[in-house]
Amino acid sequence: MASVPSPYQTHVPLPSHPDEKSPIAEPQIFVVPIHIVTHASQLPAEFLEPSSERQIVIGFDCEGADLCRHGALCIMQLAFPDAIYLVDAIQGGEMLIKACKPALYFQFGIKLNNVVDTQIAYSLIEEQEGRARSSDDYISFVGLLADPRYCGISYLEKEEVRVLLRQDPKFWTYRPLSELMVRAAADDVRFLLYIYHKMMAKLNERTLWYLQFRGALYCRCYCVNDNNYADWPSLPPVPDNLIVEGKAPEEEILSVLDVPPGKMGCIIGRRGATILLIKESCNAEILIGGSRGPPDKVFIIGAVKEVRKAEAMLRGRMLDL
């Protein structure tokens, strides 16, 4: 743990009874320190040496310059109930990041696993509660925070950072970290534990399994390799209690399409019109590389029939007219 008092603090909302599978009332607000980490010894022991007997939930995000296959990881944010840790990948270097384990794949060779993606969870809850599935992109983090079912707050500071990033894509590479950088990095994770518990209280057994399964597929989008993920943990099996009269929920697959040079524009279309039309025609998630992985690939997640349909439509767009 960090032994030097931190000059930074922030407010973290936490549920009153996080272990109960019931709607969560008003959150309790705690003042917690923000630690800037440059050495693994500054991190909690239960994080560095995890135990299967004592599982912990951590809010996780990362910042960097062009974060994808060839980008540079600059900061990893870790939210615990009693503190927020900003792991400085630039000052701490490769040894620090490898000690943390849940980092990014291409820069440090570390796989993502056991990740609860709040965007996926939000989408599954919307479907579970009978709302129409959107063919557009997942809800933004700002939109999630604004939803009164989760936090119901505005995050105006996020737009300020976005403007700075558009002006200077190397914003997160500069050192020492400014107060704005520290605040912005902490704000991206300080609500995650509360949102996590709110979502877990809403998910039923079926959507919880889909969250685990779909989340595992999404992690593979970040970490494309040449061995078809043979060295990855197995995908979560269907629980016995979801098998009714011998029928199990339809499993989903991940398909990765390589896009020839100059063809991505044909897939996306003017102002995204083409890719949106394909999404509306298929009951599958279609992700363009970049933020989700290599920029020359398209990722399709869904039931086999819908994935094959999306593949055919996308390949058709890539053909020379």
Q: Model segments located where?
A:
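N-terminal accessory regions of nucleic-acid-interacting proteins
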Residues: M1-I58, R220
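Conserved DEDDh/DEDDy metal-dependent 3′-5′ exonuclease domain
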Residues: F30-K202
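Short cationic amphipathic helices and targeting signals
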Residues: I34, A83, D296-G302
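Beta-strand cores of modular interaction/reader domains in eukaryotic scaffold and signaling proteins
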Residues: I58-G59, Q77, L86, D258, ...
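The conserved glycine-aromatic submotif of the RRM
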Residues: A72, R292-F299
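Acidic catalytic cores of enzymes that act on phosphate-bearing nucleotides/polynucleotides
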Residues: H197, K202-C266, A273-E280, I301
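Polar interaction faces of repeat-based domains
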Residues: C282-P294, M318-L319
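Charge-rich, low-aromatic oligomerization/scaffolding segments with amphipathic character
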Residues: F299, A303-L321
